[in-house]
């Protein structure tokens, strides 16, 4: 019976430790490259779209950025923006994400003006201030928009319209910044 206890100890403890070690290594070896290829695929599609139609790209990025943020996939696009800035001195994608952020501000402002519930008014006002100063949309996105499909759709439409306009005007940034009032100076670009 003592031998059975040792076998159980070895099976559950040592094999468990090896399972964690090998599981993480396999994740890095298998899942890591898949993430890289998905990110590169997104990058290629976005750059191809920008070359073909700034308006369509603006609609897709401006309207779809909050969906990408809600799944955490938006981080795959950030290296593209950084590379564009280092290679060309400006980037077309970053301003399109601004459209999403300001559409979230607009939606939260609409909720603030229409809501009767003081807690909802307070939450939406906090969201407006947070996004305007720091460009962090996640609290408002998950706390208010994802829960209400009409608000989420309104934000997506607003972001798409704003993105289309920014794409039409070929607006660029010269810095890798997230869309807020404090980052407007990044739009001052010469010879873009």
Where in the sequence are the language-model features?
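Short, proline-centered helix/strand-breaking motifs
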Residues: 1, 136-139
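Signature of multi-pass transmembrane helix bundles
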Residues: 1-66, 183-192
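Alpha-helical transmembrane segments in multi-pass membrane proteins
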Residues: 3, 7, 11, 15, ...
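Transmembrane helix-loop junctions in multi-pass membrane proteins
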Residues: 21-42, 71-78, 109-114, 138, ...
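Short helix-coil transition sites and intra-membrane helix breaks within transmembrane domains
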Residues: 31-35, 53, 68-76, 99-102, ...
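Transmembrane helical segments that form the transport core of multi-pass membrane transport proteins
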Residues: 42-96
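Transmembrane alpha-helical segments and their short flanking loops
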Residues: 51-55, 80-83, 118, 127, ...
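Membrane-embedded helical hairpins/re-entrant loop segments and their flanking transmembrane helices
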Residues: 79-137, 144-149
């Amino acid at each position: 019976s003592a031998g059975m206890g040792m076998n159980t100890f070895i099976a559950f403890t040592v094999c468990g430790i090896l399972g964690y070690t090998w599981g993480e290594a396999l994740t890095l070896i298998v899942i890591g490259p898949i993430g890289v290829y998905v990110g590169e695929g997104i990058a290629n599609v976005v750059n191809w779209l920008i070359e073909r139609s700034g308006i369509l790209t603006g609609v897709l990025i401006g309207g779809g950025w909050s969906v990408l943020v809600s799944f955490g996939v938006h981080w795959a696009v950030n290296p593209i923006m950084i590379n564009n800035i280092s290679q060309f001195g400006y980037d077309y994608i970053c301003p399109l994400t601004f459209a999403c952020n300001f559409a979230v501000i607009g939606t939260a402002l609409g909720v603030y003006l229409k809501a009767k519930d003081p807690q909802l008014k307070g939450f939406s006002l906090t969201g407006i201030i947070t996004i305007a100063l720091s460009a962090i949309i996640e609290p408002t996105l998950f706390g208010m928009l994802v829960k209400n499909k009409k608000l989420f759709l309104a934000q997506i439409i607003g972001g798409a319209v704003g993105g289309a306009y920014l794409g039409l005007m070929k607006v660029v940034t010269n810095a890798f910044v997230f869309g807020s009032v404090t980052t407007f100076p990044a739009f001052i670009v010469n010879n873009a």
